[in-house]
Swiss-Prot record:
HAMAP family: Glu_tRNA_synth_type1. This is Glutamate--tRNA ligase 1. CDD domains: GluRS_core (cd00808). GO terms for cellular component: cytosol. Catalyzes the attachment of glutamate to tRNA(Glu) in a two-step reaction: glutamate is first activated by ATP to form Glu-AMP and then transferred to the acceptor end of tRNA(Glu). A motif ('HIGH' region) lies at residues 10-20. GO terms for biological process: glutamyl-tRNA aminoacylation. Monomer.
Length: 469
């Protein structure tokens, strides 16, 4: 078997969407599993919408996810360049080859004339499939002269054979496109830029791509691409069209379902390992049904056979759970480094590590850290009502806490025990009211952890504030 070569070919017209990230991930996993090559190609032929800033963001997001590529626009490779805007000469060269072989032809129709033809076919109840007979009448000597005078170039159309095309898709199975289901289609636009289907085939063919794994919204394009492979006499890659990602309500995933870009999840404090784990299970399943997986485990267990046909549901709650699991898998040194930017406070690592240890099991998104940890940096804004029982209880506790020389959990527990012997507040009431006195909140980390982290002076000060209010 020849070396597996797969690619991810995004358009730099926006931020990397989770659907695109999943496509990149499946290609990456297959390349790493087979010892093949993962190629990054930038499809920037949409001159109006493509922006350099989005290309930079795509590259940044893929690097953050840990999906490193073997060839690409930033590192080069044997089959570059890896930006379509730098390959336009190739598209013209191969279009000319097809014209010379009678497999493609020039069309001197203006875009609005093509649109009128489309509307006419639809009004007649016909599919808007163009043929050479429909398009070549525009190629009059007068029109050619007009184009020349205006400095315009003709579009180039591919002459589609009227035959059935059969695709053996590794996810969908056998897919048949009946003869006449697709008409002739443009290869080069009148502005000289290639269409998606054409550029895609030229690039995949010249870059020796062996497998094309992508979303099933591209399935309808495949017949045009296969026809072009046959026209050039190139081997057709193996196609695999993975299921669409749906929102929790069963409709196509969109911004109304919440965050959909990798950048948004990153800014909310999702770990790349968690997002990769989650995306891998949208359209693929582990042979043993495991759900928490490292990238290495994903590589080792990945196979095309386990890609599923059914649409995948994007469940934000499951992603939160996975993120919390991956957070707990991190060493404290790693977590301090990753989490510190989300804290928005200048704090030394040792103190922050103690706080993280106390709140780690409560973190779903690292962006929650300011809210989860504010009790360690701010005195409570609201204090519980002062009652005679509480005053007596916490005056006694304060006295016991002041006696402690070595501030640790054992000493604090001992102080609790002594204070409660004569306390008017017992058990649950003792601890719940003390939590409110120290934090102003009814829930949070273990109470003993709060006292230990705050330290003797701060605890004494907070209890004194309550008693003296």
């Amino acid at each position: 078997m020849s070396e597996v070569r797969v690619r991810f070919a995004p358009s730099p017209t926006g931020y990397l969407h989770v659907g695109g990230a999943r496509t990149a991930l499946f290609n990456y996993l297959y390349a790493r599993k087979t010892g093949g090559k993962f190629i990054l190609r930038i499809e920037d032929t949409d001159l109006e919408r493509s922006e350099k800033v989005f290309e930079e963001q795509l590259i940044s997001a893929l690097k953050w996810l840990g999906l490193e590529w073997d060839e690409g626009p930033d590192i080069g490779g044997q089959y570059g360049p890896y930006r379509q805007s730098e390959r336009v000469h190739l598209y013209h060269e191969y279009a000319q080859k097809l014209i010379e072989e009678g497999k493609a032809y020039e069309v001197y129709a203006y875009p609005e004339e093509i649109e009128q033809l489309r509307e006419k076919l639809l009004s007649e109840g016909k599919a808007p499939h163009y043929t050479r007979e429909m398009l070549e009448p525009y190629n009059t000597p007068e029109r050619k002269k007009e184009y020349e005078e205006k400095g315009l170039k003709p579009a180039v159309y591919f002459s589609m054979l009227r035959k059935d095309y059969v695709i053996n898709d590794v996810v969908k199975g056998e897919v048949v496109f009946k003869a006449g289901s697709v008409g002739d289609f443009a290869l080069l636009r009148s502005n000289g830029m290639p269409t998606y289907n054409y550029a895609c085939v030229i690039d995949d063919g010249l870059m020796k791509i062996t497998h094309v794994l992508r979303g099933d919204d591209h399935l309808s394009n495949t017949v045009k691409q296969v026809a072009l492979y046959e026209a050039f006499g190139w081997p057709t890659p193996v196609f695999g069209h993975v299921s669409m990602i749906l929102g929790p309500d069963g409709s196509k995933l969109s911004k109304r379902h919440g965050a959909t870009s990798v950048e948004e999840f990153k800014s909310r404090g999702y770990l790349p390992e968690a997002l990769v784990n989650f995306l891998a299970l949208l359209g693929w399943s582990h042979p043993e049904g495991k759900e928490i997986l490292t990238k290495q485990e994903l590589i080792e267990s990945f196979s095309l056979e386990r890609l599923v046909k059914n649409p995948a549901i994007f469940n934000p709650e499951k992603l939160k759970w996975m993120n919390s699991e991956h957070i707990r898998m991190k060493s404290m040194d790693e977590l301090v480094k990753i989490a510190k930017p989300f804290l928005q406070k200048d704090v030394d690592d040792e103190y922050f590590a103690k706080i993280l240890h106390a709140v780690k099991d409560r973190i779903e998104e690292l962006s929650q850290l300011p809210e989860l940890t504010d009790i360690f940096f701010e005195k409570p804004h609201q204090l519980p009502e002062k009652t005679p029982e509480a005053i007596e209880t916490y005056t006694n506790l304060l006295s016991e806490l002041k006696k402690i020389e070595k501030w640790d959990k054992d000493s604090i527990y001992a102080a609790f025990k002594t204070a409660m012997k004569s306390a008017k507040l017992k058990g649950k009431d003792f601890y719940m009211t003390l939590r409110l006195v120290l934090t102003g909140k009814t829930e949070g980390p273990e109470l003993i952890d709060i006292l230990e982290i705050l330290g003797k002076d701060e605890v004494i000060e907070r209890i004194s504030l309550y008693l003296n209010k």
